[in-house]
Regions:
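Solvent-exposed, well-ordered amphipathic alpha-helical segments
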Residues: 4-13, 30, 34, 47-48, ...
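Membrane-targeting and insertion segments and their boundary/processing signals
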Residues: 69, 103, 169, 173-181, ...
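Internal transmembrane alpha-helical bundles of multi-pass membrane proteins
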Residues: 194-386
């Protein structure tokens, strides 16, 4: 990038209001060019929505190499003009149009677009998602990959297993179905574009499949670290991606629970305790970046299970043109509020928390500390609330 002023054509990813440290609300625009994504501050007169194309001038003097490597940074801008809307050309844009056509409520349409296509969400919906604590369900990640894989496997098994049993009993249908599922996931990854959490989940799935074929132990922290390093080597900007950090941390805590605690309980108990463990263990990391805390966030413990049914069902409904069936329920749900507050985590506590997390690899007693940090966070909230 050349220093000084530069004229750009960019697409609006999201537009939302944010309260500044001086108490004033500002209009934040997240814009995407062919080479990078950046934030800028708009004016009250700007009327930009997600998907709009705009022409603007920016000042890039303060963009550091680290910021540019991260591919997401801030640049002041001026002379912002909305360009005439062009017909959707890409497959992704056409799918977005199909989703929006099924919903009168643009917020709900935006929610489904984020669920299925990994598009960004605006400020109001972002606040609703934070209030419920379901950001990990909205952002496409390993959870979605698991649901997609399970549904694909169920359909393939239902249709093709009898054929394999009669004509190809010597072949492993599980192996063949897994290859087909990976091809489906590759196409999905191409369609939705680069999403760090989905990339991590996909690479781990491939690594896990390879290890199963070679009869190598899967539950291994070094496998996880290897996939993380490989991902960063391919895409250095992941070092500065919060979503990638959350994704890796969530899987790490799943590994910790399965490694230390799962053998002591039944399958049913583990399905409940694993959910609780990861929820509390992740709390400090989430609060450090998104300090909103509310008792309503406990509902995610139940929503995690319901999502496994809702996600494929809502996809099928959209496929047949009935995507608006849950709109009224979702609108009321997103609007519902309980008392909330901002609980700010200091950098020292955050670094201590991460150091303890790494120690979990070698020392079992430390595996109890991250969820205890999370429990303490809610206790502090209750004390302040009372």
């Amino acid at each position: 990038m050349d220093n000084g002023e530069q004229e750009l054509t960019a697409r609006v990813i999201s537009s939302y209001q944010k309260m500044g440290s001086d108490g004033k609300k500002r209009q934040i625009l997240k814009l995407q060019t062919d080479d990078f994504t950046f934030y800028t501050i708009g004016s009250k007169s700007d009327d930009f929505r997600a998907g709009d194309s705009i022409f603007l001038s920016v000042i890039n003097l303060d963009v550091s190499f680290k910021d540019y490597l991260a591919s997401t940074f801030y640049m002041p801008s001026f002379s912002r003009e909305k360009l005439p809307q062009k017909p959707a050309h890409s497959f992704n844009q056409k799918l977005q149009s199909l989703i929006y056509a099924q919903h009168e409520n643009s917020k709900i349409a935006q929610l489904y677009s984020a669920l299925f296509l990994g598009t960004n969400i605006d400020g109001e919906l972002r606040d609703d998602v934070s209030n419920w604590g379901v950001a990990h369900l909205i952002a496409i990640s390993g959870y979605h990959l698991g649901v997609i894989s399970a549904v694909c496997f169920f359909i393939l098994r239902l249709v093709f297993k009898p054929i394999y049993a009669r004509y190809m009993p010597y072949r492993s249908y599980i192996f063949d179905f897994t290859i087909v599922i990976f091809l489906v996931l590759c196409f999905y990854f191409y369609m939705i574009g680069f999403i760090a959490s989905f990339l991590r989940a996909f690479l781990m799935s491939v690594a896990g499949f390879y290890m199963i074929c070679k009869k190598i132990k899967i539950l291994n922290f070094y496998t996880l670290f290897g996939v993380i390093l490989f991902s960063v080597a391919l895409f250095p900007q992941l070092l500065f991606n919060v979503g990638f950090y959350f994704s890796c941390l969530g899987v790490f805590y799943i590994y910790v629970y399965l490694f230390y605690f799962a053998p002591k309980f039944s399958v049913l108990a583990n399905s409940l305790l694993l959910n609780l463990y990861v929820f509390f263990a992740m709390e400090v990391a989430v609060l450090y970046f998104f300090p909103l805390i509310s008792l309503l966030q406990f509902s995610v413990l139940a929503i995690n299970y319901l999502f496994g049914v809702f996600y494929p069902l809502s996809f099928l409904l959209h496929l047949f043109g009935y995507g608006s069936i849950f709109d009224e329920i979702l609108s009321k749900m997103l609007a519902f509020r309980l008392s909330s507050n901002n609980l700010h985590i200091s950098t020292f506590v955050f670094l201590l928390y991460n150091a303890i997390t790494l120690l979990c690899v070698k020392f079992k007693p430390t595996a109890l500390l991250p969820p205890l940090f999370g429990v303490a966070s809610f206790l502090l909230f209750l004390l302040n609330f009372s």
